[in-house]
């Protein structure tokens, strides 16, 4: 019997344990940041342990970094976390993409951009959106701080193998509809827990035709569908992306092995979902989890339970309204979901020649310094600034309310991030998850049908 892609990568990394029980996995790459690593490093010190594989451990600063004055960190806790990681990197011999360095940025962008993320690897990080790296045909998943310490000490991790869920996506995406709309539609349709206990393999002609940026967007939000893992078969698009990157010096001798990473025709999946995207619309969330979304043309649904009522109360909306009825106050282009170069290029096409409404605060936060530099070479910064956007330094920024970039209480934000929970972007902030194109088209203060304005 054939194997799934996920099974192939998993089985190659099992050091000990039987199927159906926790198995000891070898970890090929450990990515860390300033929030979930301090206690783990301290645990090593208390036990007088060394870092097992500093050569497989890479750090960046992203969650707490300011995006305006990056070297003036006013928050004491944020400053302590950042300086602690800088010291730990020195003490334990960890390569760090430090503040202001050419590669610094959001951890899930730094890995792919530097060539650290590669097909067939097991990759962990103390961050729930680590599934992003699964777009390369890797097994990548988020872990907690105690698990971070375990990987520090042993370069291994106990995990129970999940079931396999195949999501077969076909059809040509309509103009103005993107990878972000695909994953939002899946979560809206099947719920925030449909992937619980599964590894999601995204397949089909639509996936094959996506860029690596689009594939990363889809895998990034596997966790919002309840899954720890999202994975896509590596192909020539993947290999071309990895080739020539700083940490991909093993490319020539590895690519033939990477071509073996695919699900066999006779592989058995525990569940299969099929999706035709040929009539898919732009998606907009109305509530307080990613499942609470609609097609742009649809009204918001009736109240079915207490959770719906609470969401409507928090968001200041009512059933029957539409996305175009929302009075927006913020537009945020950023996050590990949609702050890559192609995202900014697409948004710039819509923004060019327009002006941000006086009632709108619009900011662009490139996900990494690499993206920022490439965007500036293309003149994207000028396009955004001429339209009235703020052009910021890289970081997690407004995706989460733990740095200076926050949405004011009661204000609606068109956001390219991944979570719309209560308080996610700041106390009382009202988040609407959309694609970069939809966010860019909302600069006049209202959501509009981006299919009518995309160029």
Swiss-Prot record:
Sorted UniProt keywords: 4Fe-4S, Amino-acid biosynthesis, Branched-chain amino acid biosynthesis, Iron, Iron-sulfur, Leucine biosynthesis, Lyase, Metal-binding
Pathway(s) served: Amino-acid biosynthesis; L-leucine biosynthesis; L-leucine from 3-methyl-2-oxobutanoate: step 2/4
Obligatory cofactor(s): [4Fe-4S] cluster
Amino-acid positions noted as binding [4Fe-4S] cluster in the UniProt annotation, renumbered to this chain: 336, 396, 399
Cofactor binding mode and count: Binds 1 [4Fe-4S] cluster per subunit.
Superkingdom of the source species: Bacteria
Keyword flag Lyase: yes
EC number: 4.2.1.33
CDD domains, sorted: IPMI
PANTHER family according to UniProt: 3-ISOPROPYLMALATE DEHYDRATASE, HOMOACONITASE, MITOCHONDRIAL-RELATED
NCBIfam families xrefs: leuC, PRK05478.1, PRK12466.1
Protein task: Catalyzes the isomerization between 2-isopropylmalate and 3-isopropylmalate, via the formation of 2-isopropylmaleate.
Entry similarity comment: Belongs to the aconitase/IPM isomerase family. LeuC type 1 subfamily.
Protein name per UniProt: 3-isopropylmalate dehydratase large subunit
Origin species: Staphylococcus aureus (strain MRSA252)
Lineage: Bacteria, Bacillati, Bacillota, Bacilli, Bacillales
